[in-house]
A protein has these predicted regions:
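Non-globular targeting/processing and membrane-anchoring segments
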Residues: 1-90, 122, 192-235
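Short active-site neighborhood of thiol/selenol oxidoreductases, capturing the structured segment around
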Residues: 84-113
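Loop/helix-junction capping segments adjacent to catalytic residues or to phosphate/diphosphate-binding pockets
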Residues: 103, 135, 221
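Structural microenvironment flanking redox-active thiols in thiol-disulfide oxidoreductases
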Residues: 109-162
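Thiol/selenol-based redox catalytic cores and closely related redox-interacting motifs
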Residues: 154-220
């Protein structure tokens, strides 16, 4: 346990996990263990949130393989509008949803995506990241992760809602996240305390989902090797 807010105390562990020579799932697992060590009460609250979401079937009705991936038209970190139709005209697209620039698991995920972006682009595919944070935070997120792909702002989680990915964190997690030092209302520009379930959809040039990873346990993400394989298969 630590007297520092969790957000601050976790930075050293985040940097360690980011720099590990390991798979994304191993890095995420190491981070989850660090969270539990630093704040057992926070980790226990997360476990309760995940159990509630799993019991309610959160994310199960998000687009399935073979179904159309609904279009979007969202601003990137520089304010430019980016559309799914525009992206998929150049090849398969990995559409990744993140809780925000503040989420250490999302940060690890985005760093891992940035590390393989050149390989993905060489094979004629693309990546786009979507989160509910305002533009200034999208810019910070992109800079920190060294990503060259667009970081899009889904204001008020409208697109996530259309994909049945939106969840309310609940009163307990509101308190825990705030006490940890993360100011979600400021980041999003609203007080709804709604977050997207982290998810990855591989969309083909025909507009249909070729692969998906949707898990209400935000500590888990699509493995990078699996994403690369799915993008190859989508051609």
């Amino acid at each position: 346990m630590t007297s520092k807010p969790l957000a601050e105390a976790l930075e050293e562990a985040f940097r360690h996990c980011r720099d590990m020579d390991a798979s994304l799932s191993e890095r995420l697992g190491s981070l989850a263990r660090a969270v539990r060590t630093l704040s057992p009460s926070f980790a226990d609250a997360v476990d309760r949130l995940i159990a509630r979401l799993q019991q309610s079937g959160a994310g199960e009705s998000a687009p399935q393989i073979g179904e159309p991936l609904p279009p979007f038209h969202l601003p990137d970190e520089a304010g430019r509008m980016v559309s799914l139709d525009e992206l998929r005209s150049n090849g398969p697209v990995a559409v990744t949803f993140h809780r925000g620039h503040w989420c250490p698991y999302c940060r690890l995920n985005t760093v891992a995506l940035a590390q393989v972006q050149k390989e993905i682009e060489r094979e004629g595919s693309q990546i786009v990241a979507i989160m509910p944070d305002r533009q200034q935070f999208a810019e910070e997120f992109k800079t920190e992760s060294k990503a060259r792909f667009p970081i899009l702002t889904d204001m008020d989680n409208g697109y996530a809602l259309s994909l049945n990915l939106l969840i309310w964190v609940g009163a307990e997690m509101e308190r825990m996240i705030s006490a940890a030092g993360w100011d979600i209302p400021s980041y999003q520009g609203n007080t709804s305390w709604m977050l997207p379930i982290p998810a990855t959809f591989v969309g083909g040039t025909d507009g249909r989902v070729k692969a998906r990873f949707v898990d209400p346990d935000y500590r888990k993400r699509m493995e990078i090797e699996g994403l690369i394989a799915a993008l190859r298969s989508a051609h």
